Amino acid sequence: MKQTICGLAVLAALSSAPVFAHQEGDFIVRAGIASVVPNDSSDKVLNTQSELAVNSNTQLGLTLGYMFTDNISFEVLAATPFSHKISTSGGELGSLGDIGETKHLPPTFMVQYYFGEANSTFRPYVGAGLNYTTFFDESFNGTGTNAGLSDLKLDDSWGLAANVGFDYMLNDSWFLNASVWYANIETTATYKAGADAKSTDVEINPWVFMIAGGYKF
């Protein structure tokens, strides 16, 4: 009988023990699906009413964070390279469609504030920081080269970033996450139209939607 009572007491103590979310000194790792959805616009292309546009793409998203206090963290967003098709939109060149492609990596450095207490199961947060985007493997496809375009290059970009999200603790270590990010990404596309050097300023300014699982240690 005593053993039964002791066993029940232990179970009750365990079931009532708080699940600790993020607290000072914790490292936080998340991995999941990140979708980049551009909110793009550009200068007019080649003296027409057409603009350059960039499509959406989904890749593996990763974040690594460190809790300086129970409520404040520093976090880095990373991902596998995003691939985007570049197209013409509207005006005289809109019918060309996809004319090229590029890849980019968008490491983003954030300071985040977590609401609630260290033992809260649900931890919403907001953040602000700086995005760096580097473009690579830029090229025109057959449609672009047939239109006389060549030598595509996109400048790297620095810009402000912000996000909101939440973590939901499953136990003391594992949790689920959902977040939305916004980054100010502006670049200049340089290229040749025939033998003439051209440039077009492009604002990509994407929303990034991420669903992830996480682990803290």
Swiss-Prot record:
Keywords: Cell outer membrane, Membrane, Signal, Transmembrane, Transmembrane beta strand. Its main location: membrane. It comes from the Bacteria. It holds the Pfam family OmpW. The keyword Zinc does not apply. One of its GO terms (biological process) is transmembrane transport. It is found in: Cell outer membrane. One of its GO terms (cellular component) is membrane. Residues 1-21 form the signal peptide. PANTHER family: OUTER MEMBRANE PROTEIN W, PTHR36920. Belongs to the OmpW/AlkL family. This is Outer membrane protein W. It comes from Vibrio cholerae serotype O1 (strain ATCC 39315 / El Tor Inaba N16961). The lineage of its organism: Bacteria, Pseudomonadati, Pseudomonadota, Gammaproteobacteria, Vibrionales.
